[in-house]
Amino acid sequence: QNLKLFLKVQSLSLDKNVSKNLLNFLRKFNTPTVCNAIEVAEGKRGFNNFTRETMCCSSVDEAPIVGFALTAKISAKNPTDEPVEATKKRRMDYYKYISTATKASVAVIEDTDFPGCVGAYWGELNANIHKNFEIVGAITNGLIRDLGDLPSGFPVVARSIGPSHGFVHVKEIDI
């Protein structure tokens, strides 16, 4: 099955017209199967370029998260020392960035406070905003909160669960 997955992916063109079909195809496979396929592609065993820490998912019943990465960095431990208008502008620039993204994208957000994360960017509000922009899910090394209030169909994979949003603010976009 791993070799079949590798050969099928190799046969699909990566141009924008086929990308949606490729992403839908890849959603059929779990992470261990993808790791095995990478070993087939590399021609050797021992692939280990993956997260080794325990992660948590907002819903284990959701389909695998597959898509084009939308990247940003956030921080929540301390309030930003820049002018309020600059922080608001960057937040709006981030929302513009995700609103114009290729559909079937995944938000990949690095919390620069890691490993001492204190504020969750991913909660009810941001999960709903991203889902309404047709982002298919999120991955972060930071925190998630509001587990019972997150929208269905928008899985979030996070390093941990935490109750606070702290002083969360976007630091960098499209990195």
Q: What is each model feature region?
A:
Residues 155, 159-175:
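Acidic, glycine-rich flexible loop/linker segments
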Residues 47-50, 74, 108-110, 138-142, ...:
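General beta-strand structural signal in soluble alpha/beta enzymes
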Residues 112-114, 143-146, 160-163:
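Acidic, glycine-rich active-site loops and adjacent beta-strand->loop/helix elements
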Residues 2-7, 86-104:
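Short, composition-biased local secondary-structure segments
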Residues 11-93:
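N-terminal low-complexity or amphipathic/hydrophobic leaders
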Residues 96-141:
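Extracellular/luminal Protease-associated
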Residues 140, 150-153:
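Glycine-rich phosphate- or other oxyanion-binding loops that anchor nucleotides, phosphorylated ligands
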Residues 62-65, 98-102, 131-132, 148-150, ...:
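Solvent-exposed alpha-helices and their adjacent loops that cap or buttress functional pockets
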